[in-house]
Amino acid sequence: MKKLSQIGIIVWIVVLSGLSSPVKAFVIPPSIESQAATKLVHIQIKAKQGNADAQFLLGLMNLSGRFVTQDTKQGLSWINLAAQQQHIKAQQTLADLAFDGKLIPRDLAQAEKWYLQMVAQGDKWAHFRLGFIYSAGGDGVVRNCGKAMEQFSVAGDAVSLGNIAWILATCPEAQYRDGSRAVSMSLKLLEHNQNDPTVLDNLAAAYAELGDFSAAIDTQKKAIDALKDNPEIVRSDEFILRLKQYQNNQAYREIIPLM
C-alpha cells in the first residue's frame, strides 16, 4: 500500500506539472473589418506625415465615403496636398473635377492650372483637355482658337486632329480659320473611316468656309446618313441645322463646346 501511495503521488505531481506549463492558445485570424481599420489608420498616419500617395488615397476615400465618412471638402484638401507635391494622379483628379463641374462647380481657371502642371510632366491627356478649355473659354479663361489648336496638335490623336480641322473651319476669329487646311486634314482622317460622321461634318464645314457650298451640302448629307450607323452619336439636330445653313450659302461659326 505504501508503494502504491508513492506511485500515486508521483502521478499527481506529473499531472499538476503539466497543468502548470504554458498553454498554447488558438490564433484567431483578424476580421476583414479589423484589417480595413488597420490599413486606414496606416494611411492616415502616412498622409499626416506628408506622403503624397497616402494623401491622394485618403482624399479619394473621403470623396467616395469608402471606409470613412463622405466629406468632399476634406477629400479635396487631401488631394490638393498631394497635387502640390506633383502627384500627377492627384493633379488630374482636381483638374477633371473642376472641368466636369459635377461634384464641384465648374472652374476652368482651376482646371487650366492643374492641366498645365500635368503638361509640365509630359501628360498628353492634359493637352487634350486644355484644347477644349481654350476653344470654349469662360470661367476666367479667355477663348483662344490658336492656343486650342496648339494643345490639340500636341495631343496628336485622331479626335484632337479632327478638333483642329473643326476650329480651322468654324472659329469665330477669322485669323485662325483656314478652310484649305481643314479640308486637307479632314480628307486625311477619312482615309481611316470613310463613314465617320464627325469627320464628314468637319469636312462639310471646311468646304463651306471655302465657299464651296455644293460640296458642303453633299458632304453634310453623307454625315447625316452616317449617323444612322453610329447611334451613340446623338447630334442629328446639329447636323441638320448646319445642312440648312449650307443650303442658304452660309458658313458655320462655332466654338467647340465643353464636354
Feature-to-residue mapping (PLM):
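N-terminal leader/linker segments that initiate helical-solenoid repeat arrays
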Residues: 2, 19-63, 259
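Structural signature of tandem alpha-helical TPR/SEL1-like repeats
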Residues: 32-38, 69-78, 104-114, 138-151, ...
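Conserved structural position within tetratricopeptide repeats
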Residues: 45-48, 80-84, 116-120, 150-157, ...
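Short helix-capping/linker turns of helical repeat alpha-solenoids
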Residues: 48-52, 64-66, 85-88, 100-102, ...
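Hydrophobic face of amphipathic alpha-helices that form TPR/SEL1-like repeat modules
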Residues: 57-64, 95-100, 129-136, 164-171, ...
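Register position in tetratricopeptide repeats
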Residues: 64-66, 100-102, 117, 136-138, ...
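Terminal, low-structured helical/coil segments at or just beyond the last alpha-helical repeat
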Residues: 163, 170-180, 189-197, 201-259
